[in-house]
């Protein structure tokens, strides 16, 4: 359905350090560096960039979208817990601790360093 997702940031290096660590349990890594954006892809498909961290093209401040959330898919509850724990340790804000929601599915919610809402879940 989607070609890729962009997340606006006001501090590309700080945001990259955050996402490089929090995405590690998902086997997603930074594969492209540019002065205005960084690209991330799964380790097994490094040429298929699916996530970009970007300084806004219009050179205005990056702001969060009200009602916008990006959700990552995990292969286990352990990865959900690890993602959440890493995020909190790096300064993310809690938006919902790991646990079952919407039936048995397992979710965790955070706000990244720029205030963007991110989620991780394991379909049960």
Say what each PLM segment does:
Residues 1, 63-66, 102:
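Short glycine-enriched loop/turn motifs at secondary-structure junctions
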Residues 1-16, 70, 124:
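N-terminal beta-strand motif that seeds the catalytic metal site of vicinal oxygen chelate
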Residues 7-49:
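Core segments of cupin and vicinal oxygen chelate
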Residues 9, 31-32, 40, 63-67, ...:
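A structural feature recognizing the 12-helix transmembrane core of secondary solute carriers
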Residues 13, 21, 25, 62, ...:
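Charge-dense, helix-prone N-terminal extensions
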Residues 18, 82-83:
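Short amphipathic alpha-helical coupling segments at ligand-binding clamshell hinges
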Residues 41-82:
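Long, continuous compositionally biased terminal/linker segments
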Residues 84-124:
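Vicinal oxygen chelate
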């Amino acid at each position: 359905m989607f070609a890729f997702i962009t997340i606006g940031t006001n501090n590309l290096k700080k945001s990259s350090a955050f996402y490089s660590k929090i995405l590690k349990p998902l086997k997603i890594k930074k594969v492209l560096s540019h002065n205005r954006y960084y690209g991330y892809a799964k380790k097994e498909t490094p040429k298929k960039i699916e996530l970009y961290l970007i300084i806004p093209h219009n050179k205005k401040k990056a702001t969060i979208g009200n009602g916008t959330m990006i959700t990552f898919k995990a292969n286990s509850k352990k990865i959900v817990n690890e993602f959440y724990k890493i995020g909190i340790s790096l300064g993310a804000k809690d938006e919902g601790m790991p646990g079952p929601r919407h039936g048995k599915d397992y979710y965790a919610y955070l706000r990244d360093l720029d205030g963007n809402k991110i989620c991780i879940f394991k379909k049960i």
